[in-house]
Amino acid sequence: MIHDMIKTIEHFAETQADFPVYDILGEVHTYGQLKVDSDSLAAHIDSLGLVEKSPVLVFGGQEYEMLATFVALTKSGHAYIPVDQHSALDRIQAIMTVAQPSLIISIGEFPLEVDNVPILDVSQVSAIFEEKTPYEVTHSVKGDDNYYIIFTSGTTGLPKGVQISHDNLLSFTNWMISDDEFSVPERPQMLAQPPYSFDLSVMYWAPTLAMGGTLFALPKTVVNDFKKLFATINELPIQVWTSTPSFADMALLSNDFNSETLPQLTHFYFDGEELTVKTAQKLRQRFPKARIVNAYGPTEATVALSAVAITDEMLETCKRLPIGYTKDDSPTYVIDEEGHKLPNGEQGEIIIAGPAVSKGYLNNPEKTAEAFFQFEGLPAYHTGDLGSMTDEGLLLYGGRMDFQIKFNGYRIELEDVSQNLNKSQYVKSAVAVPRYNKDHKVQNLLAYIVLKEGVRDDFERDLDLTKAIKEDLKDIMMDYMMPSKFIYREDLPLTPNGKIDIKGLMSEVNK
């Protein structure tokens, strides 16, 4: 168990100064270097006279300087707001408007003209590192102070800045490094692929820094180049893979992504979107001895609140994989529409309470009041997810409440439709999307389909292909759930965080 993230990092800087903490395409940085660089930058930040505990925006990609900047800001008592350098300009501007940062540290080239906020660019940061200014940590982020602020990808209105405190982070980190479901290896060698602006990144950097391990960063330029991506992954000595299931699906396109090529890769951690039986089965075939962990939780509850190592029995018997056993320190309940707790087996909204729950959205009391509340004397959060609890304490996922529609009198979970579509022998991946009429009632259901390789060659017309898919699914899908229109695509759009962009497709359909 750790009690202070900075003290833990400092401990490893003293006891294993020459051990690698960050490796980005062979450029290696040690724990000793991380201490020297973050000390020097923390001293400089202190000299700027910023408002105490004010948030600082950090702009960039997967560079080592990003990590060193985060550590420096934590030492100097400031929360950091990670913003990915591939973000849309409108999003960056919206974050600036909401967050009102006291400083911008730009590791990537900052694309906006800013008059009233000082900017440190990467050349200045590098020069500050070279100064090697010693620093005594006296006013680091602690307790309920904000450690980081992650902005959600909200598709409507202003993005919301989720405030995560040092206590929130400790609740998550101590659970992850001690939980038998994760079974994090000693000194973990972890893949660092999800961008820092996505809280899934905390699932790789927090346990790694807490246990003195090494992060292996994958820049976006590599991720976006399939050939380079597969060649790079095959050379990485990683033990632990942390990503969305969608990114694993992309890796599985390479036949070399297997235990023979990557014998040391023994752990897969998934969060951020639903892990399907199909993806987990493929991974089990490629990595028969690997531990595949399905985790679940919203950003507002600090990364994840439940996790389970997927068993062969689950792969054989489950239509939908369980999303885990909940954290001991975080009471998690399923409630009805009146807010009453439901018995095991009954479906309702998942709520989480306890020390992992955020204090709310930055500078947004209205949205905070809508989502955060007190439950049995503890801070709590409405996840907006449907779920149920088994008698064994396993949480089962029932889909998003906002992805639940009423069609021809039937209540339909879009994710259920998508799950069933994915069971067809012809389908590689699929999602279901509703089309609404002018009264905002569901007019029909559409299916976006990516076909398995070679399937299209077997059918002269899309109509014949659609008939074949429907025939394939007639015994497992109710008629009222079957989409009336099938749209075939080469791939499905992803959000910046690597999730299938269902809301974007819904917007496209309902223009």
UniProtKB/Swiss-Prot annotation:
GO terms for cellular component: cytoplasm. CDD domains: DltA. Pathway: Cell wall biogenesis; lipoteichoic acid biosynthesis. One of its GO terms (biological process) is lipoteichoic acid biosynthetic process. Keywords: ATP-binding, Cytoplasm, Ligase, Nucleotide-binding. GO terms for molecular function: ATP binding; D-alanine [D-alanyl carrier protein] ligase activity. Its EC number is 6.2.1.54. It comes from the Bacteria. Catalyzes the first step in the D-alanylation of lipoteichoic acid (LTA), the activation of D-alanine and its transfer onto the D-alanyl carrier protein (Dcp) DltC. In an ATP-dependent two-step reaction, forms a high energy D-alanyl-AMP intermediate, followed by transfer of the D-alanyl residue as a thiol ester to the phosphopantheinyl prosthetic group of the Dcp. D-alanylation of LTA plays an important role in modulating the properties of the cell wall in Gram-positive bacteria, influencing the net charge of the cell wall. Belongs to the ATP-dependent AMP-binding enzyme family. DltA subfamily. It is an enzyme of class 6 (ligase). This is D-alanine--D-alanyl carrier protein ligase. Transmembrane segments: none annotated. Pfam families: AMP-binding, AMP-binding_C. ATP binds at T152, S153, N294, A295, Y296, G297, P298, T299, D385, Y397, G398, G399, R400, K499. D-alanine binds at D199, V303, K499. It catalyses: holo-[D-alanyl-carrier protein] + D-alanine + ATP = D-alanyl-[D-alanyl-carrier protein] + AMP + diphosphate. It is found in: Cytoplasm.
